[in-house]
Regions:
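C-terminal peripheral helix-coil segments that are non-catalytic and often amphipathic
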Residues: 1-3, 100, 104, 132-148, ...
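Short Lys/Arg-rich basic patches
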Residues: 5-9
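Helix-turn-helix
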Residues: 14, 18, 22, 26-60, ...
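Short coil/turn segments at alpha/beta junctions that flank glycine-rich nucleotide-binding fingerprints
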Residues: 29-33, 84, 105, 148
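Hydrophobic alpha-helical connector segments
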Residues: 64, 78-108, 155-165, 194-197, ...
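Short, basic, alpha-helical segments at the C-terminal edge of helix-turn-helix-like DNA-binding modules
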Residues: 67-72
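Amphipathic alpha-helical segments used for helix-helix packing
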Residues: 103-125, 175-183
Length: 223
């Protein structure tokens, strides 16, 4: 009896994990509004009522998917930002962590796009609980680096750099291959990921003036 009792929680956890995985794929592919709980249940192979054992409703399931999916990303960025190294190196580590996390879990990129596309339905809702905190940490490092001279940014605010990095990786992972003839390009192939990461680092270094002096033309906005 004790062994059987011990197996029940393990089975429940496996079922919950399967529900989260199925819901993540469906939310990423269809968006929140178009994803039905019946579809999630059918994908997992359980009855719709079984979902409510683990999640209070559809919104609760979506919130759990977001927390689970972005928890890994938040942990990697926290580690990169908190390492006791120079600001420029911490930012570079964060860039690498960002690319690695999105590539490792491509649904993250699609969830970001879906969240942006459905922004009118949740104008004040952040993408995931740690998003605003992580942005504050990144922007604080930007200001510290600019004040100390360790960073010589092209722009006086960090939004252009954040947009260039986030937009490039999200589009690269979630949408770029769809615009090409089938089979011509695999964005998740190791050599392509390595190339994208190098490009991302070069872009961020260029925009933040890491390792290169800031030119007068950049300060005045001239080409």
């Amino acid at each position: 009896m004790p062994a059987a009792a011990a197996r029940r929680p393990a089975k429940a956890e496996r079922t919950r994990a399967a529900i989260l995985a199925a819901a993540e794929r469906l939310f990423a592919r269809r968006g929140y509004a178009a994803t039905r709980l019946e579809d999630v249940a059918e994908t997992v192979g359980v009855k719709r009522a079984a979902l409510f054992y683990h999640f209070r409703d559809k919104q609760g399931l979506y919130d759990a998917v977001i927390e689970d999916a972005f928890g890994m990303l938040a942990a990697r960025l926290d580690e990169a930002f908190s390492v006791p190294r120079p600001i420029a190196e911490r930012i570079e580590r964060a860039v690498e962590a960002w690319v690695d996390a999105i590539v490792a879990r491509p649904a993250l990129a699609r969830l970001i796009l879906r969240h942006a596309a459905e922004a009118e339905e949740h104008p004040a809702q952040p993408l995931f609980p740690a998003a605003e905190r992580l942005l504050r940490v990144a922007f604080s490092l930007f200001e510290q680096g600019r004040t100390s001279g360790e960073l010589q940014p092209v722009h006086d605010d960090p939004f252009h750099t954040a947009s260039a990095l986030i937009g490039a990786t999200v589009f690269y992972v979630s949408a770029f291959a769809a615009l090409l003839p089938p089979g011509d390009f695999d964005p998740l192939a190791p050599e392509q990921v390595a190339a994208h990461k190098r490009d991302a680092l070069r872009t961020v270094r260029r925009l933040l003036g890491i390792g290169t002096p800031r030119r007068a033309a950049e300060r005045t906005g001239r080409p």
